[in-house]
Design a protein with these regions (language model features):
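Terminal, regulation- and interaction-focused segments at domain boundaries
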Residues: 1-31
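Preference for bulky hydrophobic residues occupying beta-strand positions
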Residues: 3-7, 43-45, 56, 67
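Ordered, soluble secondary-structure elements with a strong preference for glycine-centered loop motifs
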Residues: 8, 12-15, 68, 72-80
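Ser/Thr-rich, low-complexity intrinsically disordered terminal regions
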Residues: 20, 24-58
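Short, charged/polar low-complexity linear motifs in solvent-exposed/disordered segments
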Residues: 33-34, 60-62, 70, 82-84, ...
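Intrinsically disordered, low-complexity regulatory segments enriched in Ser/Thr/Pro
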Residues: 55-75
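A conserved amphipathic terminal alpha-helix motif
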Residues: 73-102
Length: 102
C-alpha cells in the first residue's frame, strides 16, 4: 500500500507535526512509531483489526507512506485513515499546539 501526500510546510515543520502524530498514534492506538532519522519513521501496530506496518518518509514537500497491504476488504479504510491523519496534521492552518496527542 502506498500513499503520497503533498504538503505546503517546510520539511522541519512537517517533521515536527508528524512526530506529534506519532505520539497520538502511540497513545491512542498503541501503534509503535520509531524515527529512524529526520526523514524516516517506521510504524508498527493495529488500528481496529487492520495491521499497520510500514515506513513514512519526508522529502521535498511530500510525505510518503509505504506499507503492508491489509488486503482488499480493509485497504480503502486503512488508506482513508492514514490520508485523513496526514491531512489533519500537515494542515498549515492548524497550529501545532492544537494537534491532539491522545
Amino acid at each position: 500500500m502506498e500513499i503520497d501526500y503533498p504538503y505546503a510546510l517546510s520539511d522541519q515543520d512537517a517533521l515536527s507535526r508528524l512526530q506529534i502524530l506519532g505520539t497520538y498514534l502511540s497513545n491512542r492506538h498503541g501503534i509503535k512509531v520509531t524515527w529512524v532519522d529526520d526523514k524516516r519513521a517506521r510504524f508498527n501496530g493495529k488500528y481496529l483489526v487492520v495491521k499497520i506496518d510500514g515506513e513514512l518518509t519526508l522529502d521535498g514537500g511530500h510525505a510518503r507512506f509505504r506499507g503492508e497491504d491489509p488486503g482488499f476488504l480493509w485497504r480503502n479504510r486503512a488508506k482513508d485513515y492514514i490520508q485523513n491523519k496526514l491531512a489533519a496534521y500537515l494542515d498549515p492552518k492548524t497550529a501545532q499546539s492544537a494537534l491532539p496527542t491522545s
